[in-house]
Amino acid sequence: MNWLRWFKIKNIYVINGPNLNFLGIREITQYGSTSFDELINLVNSEAKKLKIKIDFFQSNVEGEIVNYIQNLVNNENTWIVINPGAYTHTSIAIRDALQTYSQNNEIVEVHISDINQREQFRKINLISDICNKSIIGRGVQGYIEALEYINEQ
């Protein structure tokens, strides 16, 4: 057992892209009835149990997400948990920012719905190959699985 990891608090930045602030309102059959605020509470509760420090960021604006990631590039031993939403399929800018971040840090991609079982255009994923792990189609539980994965590293 690695005793050192029990004393080290990990810093995780949870980034959510467009329309995720509408969880519990939009497309409940795809995304479930959990609201965005409930998701934040759920993740914070699990993080507290695991002694993980969490910072949340959500934006519907691509450039704001890029700026947020760029501001994290020089932070060492941090993780990003990202659900880029629709930007998964379209944003080279977010991919480039994540790729720079990944040179010194780790990334877990989360998608609430199974993007591989949806419309053809959603099967394009511009970020999965630069992420350490992808958790897809597990509902909001995917965020908890991301924390558990990070905690095991």
Ranges and model annotations:
Residues 8-13:
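Extreme N-terminal starter segment of soluble prokaryotic enzymes
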Residues 18-20, 85-88, 113-115:
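Short glycine-rich anion-binding loops that position phosphate/pyrophosphate groups of nucleotides
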Residues 23-38:
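Glycine- and acidic-residue-enriched helix-capping/strand-helix junction motifs
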Residues 55-63:
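Short beta->alpha junction loops
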Residues 90-102:
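Short Gly/Thr/Asp-enriched flexible loops that form oxyanion-binding sites at enzyme active sites
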Residues 100-116:
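Short, acidic/small-residue loops that bind anionic groups at enzyme active sites
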Residues 103, 116-153:
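Short, glycine-/small-residue-rich phosphate/pyrophosphate-handling segment
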